[in-house]
């Protein structure tokens, strides 16, 4: 869910909570998780692995299909940029009064918000020799051990991972245990894409301009090394990549 102003109302007090389709969001995550995008430590090129471009192309295509503006794929460096235009009108005089270089691209005087996530996944478990990823949903998790892979006898147990205890009754998305799921950060990618689609489908929700950026190679420390600052020119930016719901880190980045 997200919080946004209601269309037609003015002032920061006009807020509404919007609920996304959970099934659609889960399906989006599974679709992205199936694309192998493992980055590689010690490679000077960006992206460090060419497989990351497959997800970049998929996201570019989906952004165009949903109606996002200024969709740009940096094919060489594997960055994806897009814009969800703001719909809070402002007079030409107010726009012209802005001194920054973004004046002509602003649809309104609200701050431009940036949402970013990375497409690559960790190479902590090397899956390059068998890059097929098999995510699946577990509905209404019962709180017990989860058999991920019968053949390999791989189990996900609350005794080993106590955080599972908080997930009883919820829907889990897991793999077959032979690869990482890639929820870091394809969950963030899916959330941004779902939010973009929702806002484009609901023009009655008032919001400022939102810029989107998907990066390669965050897991090897090079996520923003080749970003285009003009394509991601924002007033405030949020990286959708973290732990529990409601967790927020600010003015700090140590990944």
Mark where each language-model region is:
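A near-ubiquitous, low-amplitude feature marking generic local secondary-structure context
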Residues: 12-18, 42, 46, 65, ...
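Short, Lys/Arg-enriched N-terminal segments with co-localized hydrophobic residues
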Residues: 1-14
């Amino acid at each position: 869910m997200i919080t946004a102003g209601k269309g037609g109302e003015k002032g920061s007090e006009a807020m509404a909570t919007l609920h996304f389709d959970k099934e659609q969001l889960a399906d989006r995550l599974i679709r992205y998780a199936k694309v192998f995008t493992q980055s590689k430590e010690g490679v000077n090129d960006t992206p460090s692995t060419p497989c990351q471009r497959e997800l970049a192309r998929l996201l570019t295509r989906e952004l165009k299909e949903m109606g996002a503006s200024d969709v740009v794929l940096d094919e060489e460096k594997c960055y994806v940029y897009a814009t969800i235009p703001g719909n809070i009108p402002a007079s030409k005089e107010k726009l012209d009064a802005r001194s920054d270089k973004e004046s002509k691209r602003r649809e309104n005087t609200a701050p431009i918000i940036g949402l970013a996530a990375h497409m690559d996944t960790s190479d902590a478990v090397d899956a390059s020799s068998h890059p097929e990823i098999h995510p699946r949903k577990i509905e209404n998790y019962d709180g017990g051990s989860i058999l991920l892979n019968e053949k390999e006898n791989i189990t996900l147990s609350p005794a080993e991972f106590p955080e599972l205890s908080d997930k009883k009754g919820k829907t889990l998305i897991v793999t077959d245990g032979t690869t990482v799921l890639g929820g870091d950060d394809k969950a963030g990618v899916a959330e941004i894409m779902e939010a973009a689609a929702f806002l484009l489908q609901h023009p009655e929700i008032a919001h400022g301009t939102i810029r989107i950026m998907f990066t390669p190679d965050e897991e090897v420390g090079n996520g923003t090394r080749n970003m285009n600052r003009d394509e991601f020119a924002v007033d405030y930016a949020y990286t959708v990549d973290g732990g529990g719901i409601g967790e927020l880190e600010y003015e700090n980045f140590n990944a």
